[in-house]
């Protein structure tokens, strides 16, 4: 493991910083404990929909403005739900550190969950599941292989959910999942790249 610093912010968030000065970039990953295992049994895919909406507008920025801020800086920003955690990852130029931290803090603490974006994302995810079932056989294994191994255990449900379960998910479900499962004490933030560990820690503490 490269040299790193570890600290705990006043709000309980764990912060890991790995300075690396050879390239003018900063990469980040935010890990929030509780991914699809926290989905209600009748609504697999709720964590995945919630995670997907984190990059569809936050704080003062709607989805277009959020994407424009990321792309305008030549950065990347993605969010997804795994079995045990929701992960938000990205990379920006070191000179855009303040923007990067601001976008991340907005996404995690002030997501908009706009109704139109929810409807659009849910529809797209359902269409993707339909297409996967109609594609090559590996798509079927990806969707249903875990069910054969874990049965009705939460591990047996694909993080993506099913056509039926996604259709049953409402925006209120997303809001409820967010308030029940997102919290500073469940969050680990990891930064690596062209950073000063002390300065970054101060900036993250202010933002979060």
Predicted regions and their residues:
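Proteolytic maturation boundary segments
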Residues: 1-19, 23-29, 190, 196-208
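Solvent-exposed coil/turn segments that connect beta secondary-structure elements
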Residues: 10-14, 20-22, 31-37, 54-59, ...
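Buried hydrophobic packing residues in well-ordered domains
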Residues: 12, 30, 48-50, 70, ...
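M16/MPP (pitrilysin/insulinase) zinc-metallopeptidase core fold and M16-derived inactive scaffolds
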Residues: 27-94, 135, 157-159
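Short beta-strands and strand-coil junctions in structured, solvent-facing domains, enriched
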Residues: 35-40, 110-115, 197-198
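Acidic/histidine-enriched alpha-helical segments
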Residues: 67-72, 112-130, 142, 196
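Scaffold signal of the M16-like zinc-metallopeptidase fold and its non-catalytic homologs
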Residues: 100, 132-184, 204-207
